[in-house]
């Protein structure tokens, strides 16, 4: 769902 997309974005930022 939409929250999954948000989590993906947060994970990408954390990956930086």
Swiss-Prot record:
This is Aurein-2.4. GO terms for biological process: defense response to bacterium; innate immune response. Antimicrobial activity against B.cereus, L.lactis, L.innocua, M.luteus, S.aureus, S.epidermidis and S.uberis. Probably acts by disturbing membrane functions with its amphipathic structure. Shows anticancer activity. Strongly inhibits the formation of NO by neuronal nitric oxide synthase (nNOS) at micromolar concentrations. Acts by a non-competitive mechanism, probably by binding to calcium/calmodulin and as a consequence blocking calmodulin attachment to nNOS. Keywords: Amidation, Amphibian defense peptide, Antibiotic, Antimicrobial, Immunity, Innate immunity, Secreted. It is found in: Secreted. Expressed by the skin dorsal glands. Signal peptide: none annotated.
């Amino acid at each position: 769902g939409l929250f999954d997309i948000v989590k993906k974005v947060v994970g990408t930022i954390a990956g930086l």
